[in-house]
A protein has these predicted regions:
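His/Glu-based metal-binding/catalytic segments typifying zinc-dependent metallopeptidases
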Residues: 102-166, 321-326
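Charge-rich, well-structured scaffold segments of protease-associated domains
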Residues: 1-106, 142-143, 173-326
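Short amphipathic alpha-helix segments
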Residues: 166-174
């Protein structure tokens, strides 16, 4: 081993101090991850836990390094100003490099197992009395075996991906409830989370949730061809910007390959997006925005608000609506 046990112990102290610092930080994302992922490893920080860091040895570290950095566990993605022949030469030369040959990676664990997306809905509060406003994240589970990734990204753009989206127009501009509100997606192999994120005065929290739910309920009837046309450029001609600076394209191709997804060229992506229509957007909005897919995380000055009150607000009044058949 390159490191001695003494050197490793010294490095562990640095990492553990960083873990302490991260644990002291209060973020919506941390609370959200714990609430959504529960026992799944995705709820943990990238640094791991103090217990795990203290527990491994130099031999453990070297073994793991060999397992990860091995010839059977390498993906090389090349994009940019390079022709096919030169790419082939690079791949051939790269293939000759001996990187821990014969070391097999252990079977990969599924990111999400079992009933993760058939769980009971969650409402979580975290009180910080000194804050002026509450941070809110309303999230919905998405099954990517039923909804394509590009369809989800397109729907996200329509809902809250930018100016002109339904949430920005109604919640921020028309009603003036929030300074900013947006939606985003976290994508994994076969699952995704679509989240609506905003900050608001506590006195307006319940009203904002009601208004957002009202919009989400209406999407299955109001998404129009105009909405699709307005967003289409972002998913077709704008993709050619990837060819000017190919870092994002490179990352996307590598990510798709590692997640066992179809690896698409820019032309393929444009063609797939051009097939999206408003009827499909209505259909998947009805599939996603349902009671059983929903979680709510609120942090800030939450005194006087209870999880039961928010559950009643979310799952009670709109129970029949969210239990409609697909």
């Amino acid at each position: 081993p390159i490191w001695s046990e003494e050197q490793l112990e010294s490095e562990k102290k640095v990492v553990i101090n960083e873990i302490y610092e991260k644990e002291d930080e209060v973020t919506l994302e941390k609370i959200y991850d714990k609430a959504i992922w529960r026992k799944n490893p995705l709820k943990r920080g990238i640094l791991g836990s103090e217990e795990n860091v203290k527990g491994f040895t130099v031999d453990d570290l070297v073994g793991y390094k060999k397992e990860i950095f091995s010839k059977n566990n390498v993906t090389l993605v090349i994009t940019g100003a390079i022709d096919e022949e030169k790419s082939r030469e690079i791949f051939e030369e790269f293939g000759k490099i001996k990187i821990n040959e014969g070391v097999e990676r252990k079977e990969k664990v599924e990111v999400i197992k079992g009933r993760q997306f058939k769980r009971e809905p969650d409402v979580k509060l975290k009180n910080f009395a000194s804050w002026n406003i509450v941070d809110v994240q309303l999230s919905f589970d998405v099954d990517l075996t039923k909804i394509k990734e590009n369809e989800l990204l397109f729907l996200n753009s329509i809902i809250g991906g930018g100016d002109g989206s339904y949430l920005q127009t109604e919640i921020r501009e028309n009603q003036g409830l929030v300074y900013d509100i947006y939606s985003c997606v976290d994508i994994f192999s076969k699952e995704s989370i679509l989240s609506i994120i905003f900050s608001i005065d506590k006195s307006r929290l319940q009203l904002s949730i009601l208004e957002i739910i009202k919009i989400l309920k209406q999407l299955k009837n109001i998404i129009s061809k105009k909405d699709v046309d307005r967003n289409m450029a972002f998913f077709t001609e704008n993709l050619w910007y990837w060819a000017e600076e190919t870092k994002e394209l490179n990352f996307q191709l590598g990510s798709d390959f590692l997640n066992d997804k179809e690896v698409l060229t820019i032309e393929d992506r444009i063609m797939a997006n051009e097939r999206i229509d408003f009827q499909r957007m209505r259909e998947i909005s009805e599939m996603i925005f349902r009671k059983e897919n929903m979680s709510l995380i609120v942090i800030g000055p939450t005194k006087g608000i209870t999880e039961n009150k928010l559950r009643e607000l979310l799952y009670g009044k709109y129970d029949n609506e969210y239990n409609e058949k697909d």
